[in-house]
Amino acid sequence: IHEQQVLLCRRAIEPRHGYWTLPAGFMENGETTEQAALRETYEEAYASPELGPLFSVCNLPRGNQVHLFYLAQMTLAEYGSGPESLEVELYDEHDIPWDDIAFGTVTQTLKRFFEDRKKGVNQLHHIDF
């Protein structure tokens, strides 16, 4: 998050090549979830935000996965495209390419983020897919 915008990456890899996502990826051995979130954000978007609280836990039992999304604050709008991103942009809610979001977990996390922001609340979301 930078001011009122969210940072999205257009994927340069499969699955969902060319679609937009929040910076995300898989953990490496020995990492905490927080370390993985910061590393993936730098690898995909060359951004170094200040990590905030866990925002959403997305259960994907059919894929044997759990997706965790953290809130993270960028103090400066410094970012770029890493090797797994075609482009990286800051978006206002109304400019997000909603039809081109790569994954349902990202769409639902973004929707809940903007809903919470309008209500002035910050809560942890558990989302089942």
Name what the model sees in each region.
Residues 27-50, 54-112, 116, 120-129:
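Unchanged
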